[in-house]
């Protein structure tokens, strides 16, 4: 019996290796090594042995591609390395602008690069699919996740195993302890067309496009359905431990994106071989124009190209923003356009009083979605279109996301059609509108305009500011319409009896909302500042202001006495400076500041957000990881504290981690930190260090 088991053990290893190699040759190299009959015979033998000895079934067995029992749902998993998006360019001029910016940045940081021509670029097709992160441990696929928000995605490992072009085991001797692969899952055009024919024949709604179809397939709870739809995958990047070196002489550690693609192909992945390397922007432009014509002949959907700095050392020099790497940009192809009939124009009033015309038209399909409205932006844009009621208009989706009216077909215009004009009075409060001389924006300047107030309140309770989840748009509208709230400060004067008079409020929900509103007074200074809704001041700008000015009083004084100090802040300019000065000049805003301070807002830097301004770089060069639930800080707040003191917060533990900040219900990171000898501290110890 033992002898028989040992024979089966050795044979099953041999079968797995033969079948995995055959899959790689067939699906990735498109060069079958064995005929189908031999493959079927080997596969049948594998299944027979696994049925006899279930303990010999491994994650990298070809039998596991078919998937198991249907899942009950998808759990969220944290990306060890953030899965960032790319910044977009919508024409070659914007590509040139990006190229110029990074060239200057690189030249200033690296004196060995003296001119633009020294930059090596790589151009790749932008596959119109779904970004996927794959994690391999000791060479075996252990997890696959969707992009999600870039930090956290959904675990779809079972479904990803069904994709034949994704290896279950890397073709690499002595692989590193972990490898992360990034790539694009997609549905080939012929599979998409076949699927829609089947759905039409069975009276099911059709999928709008291959991307949506792929996304829906990956979220199927039954992996057998996923397997039947024959998704495909292109790998485009990989990450591994810095100290790892290949032991196989046939492999060289990649030092560029182009070498990385070759490496990926050699370890078992399918890569898109249409990429090209170049040293000139002109050649990148030619690549873009070539595939703009040829893309419709491809077997898969592509919506543009991606241009990257090829060398990893230059990529590292450029780094990334919170959302995207600086060393890459996606250049989108022109959007799809369609004609439709204009039905009406509505005029929306924002929190700053800006009146925005919005076109409503007969519904059309653009880039796979139904569209029936689009913003016309401002008076200048409206005038340039020469838009008349019931015009036939051309609508496109910019970047396949935002619909826009690009022109009018005047030949179809009725003789008696009326010109669309901005109203002279606010559509909400009937106050006189003004067109500010330095802007193309028509505004309502009535501080008491309810539409402005509702917009400001929505901004104040948003995630980037007070983050009051219980105050949605419908509740805000009720509070304003009933006269309970006439300013931000009035939110903090609400009583339970007033809330109970509103729709869908019981005593418990009313109490919970009042508690949440009251707790928001403790938010950090930069969140309070952002919530005030100063025009042109976004969340990142508010944070920069809070880093330079410790209180609303200091910022107020600077705005009046030395406004140039504002425009001198990195990333600021005269427009932002003027907006801040104008905001503080408004007596209504001065009244709001007094009201907020009277009800308990500090409107200044607190000890929790700046323990010692003289030690702002106390964590310089130190690496932190957060785990569990902290006592008084959210993870984002703890991260802000650490980064403001010069530290770096990572999502995964390694030997290079200096501190693990641990809270309640700490997970596996705590165990790993103990194994690696990483110093473990709690929230109070973090505050003491600060």
UniProtKB/Swiss-Prot annotation:
Residues holding Zn(2+): 426, 429, 444, 449
This protein's record includes keyword RNA-binding: no
Signal peptide from the UniProt entry: none
EC number: 6.5.1.2
SUPFAM superfamilies the record matches: BRCT domain, DNA ligase/mRNA capping enzyme, catalytic domain, Nucleic acid-binding proteins, RuvA domain 2-like
Binding residues for NAD(+): 36-40, 85-86, 124, 147, 184, 308, 332
Stored Gene3D superfamilies: 5' to 3' exonuclease, C-terminal subdomain, 6.20.10.30, BRCT domain, DNA ligase/mRNA capping enzyme, Helix hairpin bin, Nucleic acid-binding proteins
InterPro entries cross-referenced by the UniProt entry: BRCT_dom, BRCT_dom_sf, DisA/LigA_HHH, DNA_ligase, DNA_ligase_CS, DNAligase_adenylation, DNAligase_N, NA-bd_OB-fold
One GO cellular component term: cytosol
MF (Gene Ontology): DNA ligase (NAD+) activity; metal ion binding
Biological process annotations from GO: DNA repair; DNA replication
Segments forming domain BRCT: 614-690
Annotated active site: 126 (n6-amp-lysine intermediate)
Annotated catalysed reactions: NAD(+) + (deoxyribonucleotide)n-3'-hydroxyl + 5'-phospho-(deoxyribonucleotide)m = (deoxyribonucleotide)n+m + AMP + beta-nicotinamide D-nucleotide
Cofactor: Mg(2+); Mn(2+)
Top-rank lineage group of the source organism: Bacteria
Alphabetical keyword list: DNA damage, DNA repair, DNA replication, Ligase, Magnesium, Manganese, Metal-binding, NAD, Zinc
Family per similarity comment: Belongs to the NAD-dependent DNA ligase family. LigA subfamily.
Protein name: DNA ligase
């Amino acid at each position: 019996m033992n002898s028989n088991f040992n024979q089966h053990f050795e044979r099953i290893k041999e079968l797995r290796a033969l079948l995995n190699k055959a899959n790689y040759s067939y699906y990735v190299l498109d060069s079958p090594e064995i005929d189908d009959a031999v493959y079927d015979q080997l596969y049948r033998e594998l299944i027979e042995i696994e049925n006899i000895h279930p303990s010999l079934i491994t994650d990298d067995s070809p039998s596991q591609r078919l998937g198991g029992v249907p899942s009950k749902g998808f759990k969220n998993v944290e990306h060890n390395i953030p899965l960032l998006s790319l910044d977009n360019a919508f024409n070659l001029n914007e590509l040139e602008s990006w190229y110029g910016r990074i060239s200057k940045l690189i030249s200033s940081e690296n004196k060995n690069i003296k001119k633009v021509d020294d930059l090596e670029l790589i151009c790749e097709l932008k596959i119109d699919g779904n970004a996927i992160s794959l994690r391999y441990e000791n060479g075996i696929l252990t997890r696959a996740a969707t992009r999600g928000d870039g930090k956290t995605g959904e675990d779809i490992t079972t479904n990803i195993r069904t994709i034949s072009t994704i290896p279950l085991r890397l073709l690499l001797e002595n692989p590193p302890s972990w490898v992360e692969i990034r790539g694009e899952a997609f549905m080939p055009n012929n599979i998409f067309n076949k699927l829609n024919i089947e759905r039409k024949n069975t009276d099911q709604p059709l999928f709008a496009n291959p991307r949506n179809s792929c996304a829906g397939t990956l979220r199927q709870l039954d992996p057998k359905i996923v397997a039947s739809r024959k998704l495909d995958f292109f790998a485009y990047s990989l990450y591994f431990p810095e100290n790892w070196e290949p032991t196989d002489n046939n492999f060289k550690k990649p030092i560029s994106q182009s070498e990385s693609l070759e490496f990926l192909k050699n370890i078992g992945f399918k890569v898109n071989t249409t990429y090209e390397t170049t040293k000139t922007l002109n050649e990148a432009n030619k690549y873009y124009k070539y595939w703009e014509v040829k893309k419709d002949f491809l077997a898969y959907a592509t919506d543009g190209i991606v241009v990257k700095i090829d060398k990893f050392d230059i990529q590292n020099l450029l780094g990334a923003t919170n959302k995207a790497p600086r060393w890459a940009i996606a250049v989108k192809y022109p959007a799809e356009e369609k004609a439709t009939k204009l039905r009406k124009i509505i005029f929306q009033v924002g929190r700053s009083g800006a009146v925005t015309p919005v076109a409503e038209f007969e519904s059309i399909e653009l880039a796979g979605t139904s569209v029936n409205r689009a913003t016309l932006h401002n008076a200048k844009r409206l005038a340039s279109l020469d838009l008349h009621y019931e015009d036939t208009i051309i609508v496109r989706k910019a970047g396949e996301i935002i619909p826009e009216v690009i022109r009018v077909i005047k030949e179809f215009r009725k003789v008696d059609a009326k010109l669309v004009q901005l109203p002279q009075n606010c559509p909400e409060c009937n106050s006189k509108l003004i067109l500010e001389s330095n802007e193309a924006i028509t505004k309502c300047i009535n501080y008491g305009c309810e539409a402005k107030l509702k917009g400001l309140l929505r901004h104040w309770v948003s995630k980037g500011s007070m983050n009051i989840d219980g105050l949605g748009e419908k509740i805000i509208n009720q509070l304003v319409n009933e006269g309970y709230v006439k300013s931000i400060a009035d939110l903090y004067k609400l009583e339970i009896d007033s809330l109970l008079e509103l729709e869908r409020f019981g005593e418990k929900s009313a109490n919970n909302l009042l508690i949440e509103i009251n707790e928001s007074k403790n938010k950090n200074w930069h969140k309070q500042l952002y919530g005030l809704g100063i025009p042109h001041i976004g969340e990142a700008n508010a944070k920069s202001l809070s880093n330079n000015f410790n209180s609303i009083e200091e910022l107020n004084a600077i705005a009046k006495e030395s406004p140039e100090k504002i425009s001198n802040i990195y990333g600021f300019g005269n427009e932002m400076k003027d907006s801040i000065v104008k905001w503080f000049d408004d007596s209504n805003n001065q009244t709001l500041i007094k009201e907020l301070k009277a009800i308990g807002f500090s409107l200044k830097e607190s000890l929790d957000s700046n323990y010692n301004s003289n030690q702002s770089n106390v964590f310089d060069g130190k690496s932190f990881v957060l785990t569990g639930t902290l006592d008084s800080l959210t993870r984002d707040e703890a991260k802000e504290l650490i980064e403001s003191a010069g530290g770096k917060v990572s999502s995964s533990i390694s030997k290079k981690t200096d501190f693990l900040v641990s809270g309640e219900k700490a997970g596996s990171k705590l165990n790993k930190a103990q194994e690696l000898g990483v110093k473990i501290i709690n929230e109070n110890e973090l505050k003491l260090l600060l």
